[in-house]
């Protein structure tokens, strides 16, 4: 795949997601869920004006671009102006709420003083593998790119004027495709539409539909023809209007913080609203699994891929869901996804596809398991729904059983458990953050038992069992706290350290303070640690990197997650001014559409790597809520 890493814009519904560059090029298209399956290797579009060569719509020296979402929606508009021919193009991309098809609507306006003959060309290639070869097929004025499992269909309500199934690349660049073949064994093919003459000041419109027939549900050609003909007859304007209404209503319904009624900066509102609009696109409709983000690197040229569900990430994100009253999505994550992915021994593996299947892993992280229990009680604190606790009690008890064995192994130095990776999946061993999550899980389980007893059908034996379990949890929680004080505080550095092997300063040292509350934010050792964090992790631009020497992705870029974590700490410690400074840093680093990245480019102060990371957006909403609770904005 010709990897393009930055998904500047995303559109979709519950089934389909598509991502775009800032110039409007579609670079990915998923059907089924946000993480699987991706179908498009590339999808190029261009125009031929009079006798010119192709003007590649999204990368031409004479083209200028602007892009925006229709306010408070997932309807994306890209404006393209070609200064040589003086053609203005408005491209609108959206997925209807009620139809599983991507709609690309174009308006071409001739701002020249002469007539212009325009042709519109599409050149696309679908992903394939050695066991599932692909072909191109033009039938019923439709380009059907297919293999055994799926077909990607490009069509319009206009007739195709020319086509080329094999060897189309060079001819496409010349803007002149053609060939006798209507079918061929090629993963890339091209079609064109003749828009004919456009007079000065006139406009012409063209609608392109991209329909994915996954698993060849319409396996007979006549069935597929019928479905395409049905889609062609759809009222595109009505579908767009309905999508706009749906998303605006969605934002209103989930504006639990009342942000849009407050006198706040437009950037804060944009990030907040974009978070609300992004979240439902990344949740699996059936399981509740939450994708970390739209994929950026299918070929793993720079990373191990992102579009999976990490249980720990999901816990942070569901807390943000609760901030914007997405309670149903939170409960589906725990009631369905977490139950179906828990191993028999009570643990959760490192990461999963959002449909619940195990994803590629390279170890396990003990905090994944502990975080789920913490998250379940965090959700209960918001809803006070004891049935939710009851429904998940067995799952929590299984996880606690695993964690107790892990802690016993750690304290007794038995060495029976495989070493756990840390929060960042890089260091294998015993880390302060990971152990603190177990403290948080035990503390949460004690509270779960206290709340759920009234709705359980229990006899004296069960009552005594719970009482004994609570006593064990209290004892182990205290032992964990003492262990952490004795193990992870370095007297030479006068600071907590992330582990005993490299003794580095790490932003995850904040975890035992916020949100896990093992230590007070004003404890002397904690304050010493904060001083050390500020000396080692704060960048010259004012953000924070994850840990000493963090050079992931080629540079010491600050992370919104790390910077917002510092804001969390300062809010707890009562240093509101520093909290607001950290919050402002992240606010100012957002993309023009309101997306937050995994990292921030120090020079450009824009998102760097994984634009629209759900964890970043979750931390932003959680921090914003805390700031508003203190009346700081």
Each PLM stretch: what is its role?
Residues 1, 83-103, 107-305, 387:
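Acidic/polar, glycine-enriched structural segments that form the non-catalytic walls/loops
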Residues 184-187, 203-226, 292-308, 349-371, ...:
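The feature captures the catalytic groove of carbohydrate-active enzymes
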Residues 109-110, 306-410, 435, 439, ...:
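Aromatic-rich carbohydrate-recognition surfaces in CAZymes
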Residues 1-44, 306, 317, 352-354, ...:
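C-terminal capping/lid segments that line or modulate ligand- or cofactor-binding pockets
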Residues 210, 252-266, 277-281, 315-327, ...:
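Well-ordered alpha-helical scaffold segments within catalytic/enzyme domains
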Residues 277-286, 325-348, 392-414, 474-494, ...:
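Long, well-ordered core segments of solenoidal/helical folds
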Residues 1-83, 146-171, 243-265:
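An extended acidic
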Residues 154-164, 431-437, 468-561:
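Extended ligand-binding clefts on enzyme/binding-domain cores
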